[in-house]
Structure formats: C-alpha cells, structure tokens
C-alpha cells in the first residue's frame, strides 16, 4: 500500500468535502490515486457535499458585481441553510467569487449541465453529426466523437464546470463542495443573470472620420 501523506488527504478533502477519515480510507483503498479515491467516495455516497445536498437551503444572499468600467454586471443567488451562515464572511466571499466568475465567463448560461434543456443537446448533436471531418468514419467511432464533443460543449455552458478564476486547479463545483465542508451546511447556486452594456441593441454605424470631423465643427 502506498504511503498516504497528510497533504494528499487534505487535497482530497478540499476537492470532495468528505471527512478526514473517509478521505484517508478512500486513498488507502485506491493505493493513493486521488482520482480513483474521488470515485470511491462517490460510489460510497459519503462525501459531505452529497450528504448535505438533500437539506433545504432557503437562506443566503443575492450578490451583485459590476466589472471595472461598468460594462458587465452580474446578479447571482447563492443559498445556504441558515441566516447565521449567510451573514458570515466565508459565505459572503464565496458569493462574491462566484459573481466575479460569472462576469468572466461570457459563454456560461446555466448553473450545471443538468439544467441545460434537452433540445440544446439535440441541436448540438445535429450540428456535430453533420461536420465534414466525420464523413466516412464508422458509425460507432462517429458516435463516440460526437458524444465527446457534446459533453465538452455542454460543460462550456455550465457554471459549475468552469475552472475557478481565483484557483485554476479547481472547478466552481469543487469550490462549492470545499465551502460546504468548511461551513457545514448545504450550499446551492440557484440562479444568475449576466448583463452586458448595449447587448441586443442594434448600434448605428457611422463613418469614424466623419464623426470626428463633426465633433471638431468641420
């Protein structure tokens, strides 16, 4: 059996939100392989995030963030179980980080992949199946390639699957799980809206030189 270091146990705990002894056992069962240890914990259903997922999270806050210059704004609702936690600095910092994350991710439209309507996945499949680079490939190979591309595209639309802007080594989902382990309550990102100044407005295009000349009174 591989030597299980405290550093490795902490890394697994940060990624999953599971307890220290559970993480140590998972690493022992998987010979120190952290990826397999995460799978082991999920199979056993003992990660703290999963344990708390069914608990009602009706408190929390609506966080706002306006990017420098005022061109991008975000509103996001982040829920927890108690008002006490909602008023704490750890939860407030989490909500602020999530709002900044949304501001930095123009492609993100949904909280998680499960929220994406099936018609969007179906449309992506239709597009991918018609690509020229798949012509002539066996159906089974084509299907695997298409499924991989669809999964990648759907993750691009999902907030929880994005690398966290403050720490690229973890995803937003892992950040939330880590916060659940720290705070000890269920935490949910319920909904968000990203605003871009002038988005959807058809702007009148003018000759730039003529505009400058007009401003100079020529």
Swiss-Prot record:
InterPro entries: EF-Ts_dimer_sf, Transl_elong_EFTs/EF1B, Transl_elong_EFTs/EF1B_dimer, Transl_elong_Ts_CS, UBA-like_sf. GO terms for cellular component: cytoplasm. Pfam families: EF_TS (PF00889). Residues 82-85 are annotated as: Involved in Mg(2+) ion dislocation from EF-Tu. One of its GO terms (molecular function) is translation elongation factor activity. PROSITE patterns: EF_TS_1, EF_TS_2. It is found in: Cytoplasm. Associates with the EF-Tu.GDP complex and induces the exchange of GDP to GTP. It remains bound to the aminoacyl-tRNA.EF-Tu.GTP complex up to the GTP hydrolysis stage on the ribosome. This is Elongation factor Ts. The gene is tsf.
């Amino acid at each position: 059996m591989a030597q299980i270091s405290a550093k490795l146990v902490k890394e697994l705990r940060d990624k999953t939100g599971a307890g220290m002894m559970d993480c140590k056992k998972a690493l022992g069962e998987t010979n120190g392989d952290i990826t397999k240890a995460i799978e082991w914990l999920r199979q056993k259903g003992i990660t703290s995030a999963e344990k708390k997922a069914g608990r009602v999270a009706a408190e929390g806050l609506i966080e706002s963030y306006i990017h420098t210059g005022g061109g991008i704004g975000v509103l996001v609702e982040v829920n927890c179980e108690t008002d006490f936690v909602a008023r704490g600095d750890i939860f407030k910092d989490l909500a602020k980080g999530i709002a900044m994350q949304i501001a930095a991710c123009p492609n993100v439209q949904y909280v998680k992949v499960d929220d994406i309507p099936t018609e969007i996945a179906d449309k992506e499949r239709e597009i991918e199946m018609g690509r020229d680079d798949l012509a002539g490939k066996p159906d089974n190979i084509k299907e695997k390639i298409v499924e991989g591309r669809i999964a990648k595209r759907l993750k691009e639309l999902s907030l929880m699957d994005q690398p966290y802007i403050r720490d690229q080594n973890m995803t937003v989902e892992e950040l939330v799980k880590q916060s659940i382990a720290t705070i000890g309550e269920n935490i949910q990102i319920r909904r968000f809206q990203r605003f871009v100044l002038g988005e959807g407005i058809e702007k009148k295009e003018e000759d730039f030189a003529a505009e400058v000349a007009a401003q100079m009174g020529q």
